[in-house]
Amino acid sequence: MAHHPRWTLSQVTELFNKPLLDLLFDAQQIHRQHFDPQQVQVSTLLSIKTGACPEDCKYCPQSSRYKTGLEAERLMEVEQVLDSARKAKNAGSTRFCMGAAWKNPHERDMPYLEQMVQGVKAMGLEACMTLGTLNESQAQRLANAGLDYYNHNLDTSPEFYGNIITTRSYQERLDTLDKVREAGIKVCSGGIVGLGETVKDRAGLLLQLANLPTPPESVPINMLVKVKGTPLADNEDVDAFDFIRTIAVARIMMPTSYVRLSAGREQMNEQTQAMCFMAGANSIFYGCKLLTTPNPEEDKDLQLFRKLGLNPQQTSVLAGDNEQQQRLEQALMTPDTDDYYNAAAV
């Protein structure tokens, strides 16, 4: 049965055209109705298979079609991945995301991927993966292994999409989201600002996401990281207020979703990041390089959290699993500890 669209393009365009301070006020009010405004979800992302991707996404240094100097690596060993997950947990992350540069996973790799998910879950962390398109069987196997979230971004509006990617259709992306949802895995899907798109395209992306039968539980909003060698390396910078506006509109349109401040934070100053949190962002990637692009150092993130009075969010895990989380929060809030300025060391 077809569901009734929650939003129209004219409604979304109206939001984008609102005076910024009015928009931020509305977004913050909606945010406070559904979330604790002082809590931020902290995730770590690990590239478990890097480079040599056959796709032609114009923004991506992992594509085999562009000379970016990135060295291709095989799928990591399961124990290597779990070691990284332990470190992420000890540094305060509550979700561990594993990304592979594939068009889709091979059947021969599925047992290893299942072991990775099971191992991460055994630590009391939420597990997330992004592996490209999935078929029904693969989605179900990952669900049975305990995968909490699957990330598959739409990237931009359907109208602009063909300017950025030609090796995978928009419908293929939507189909993968359907298969993930049907398998009982939560959906993580967002897009990128700065691809050369118009404001109408940003509205079109958020319209697609918010009008899914069930909106994504997690919506990463990325700012383009311009990598030398990719076709978008010389794109114009995104105005910070335009990015903040996109975060705010996402929060208003998807009030119960986590809105993640994702790639591109390295280029943002503290004031821009603070305004993103004010606009309704309540999730960040922390620590490890964001796949193959830089992410702010952990201690910088924790200093910013302290300045803004934000706390890393705890997840519901087995008793005893939140010990590191409590130590992290204590270090954040206690000026006379060695970890006050470098709580990531705990």
From Swiss-Prot:
SMART domains in the record: BATS (SM00876), Elp3 (SM00729)
Cofactor binding comment, as recorded: Binds 1 [4Fe-4S] cluster. The cluster is coordinated with 3 cysteines and an exchangeable S-adenosyl-L-methionine. Binds 1 [2Fe-2S] cluster. The cluster is coordinated with 3 cysteines and 1 arginine.
Top-level EC class as recorded in UniProt: transferase
Pathway: Cofactor biosynthesis; biotin biosynthesis; biotin from 7,8-diaminononanoate: step 2/2
PANTHER family for the chain: BIOTIN SYNTHASE, BIOTIN SYNTHASE, MITOCHONDRIAL
Described function: Catalyzes the conversion of dethiobiotin (DTB) to biotin by the insertion of a sulfur atom into dethiobiotin via a radical-based mechanism.
Protein name as it appears in the record: Biotin synthase
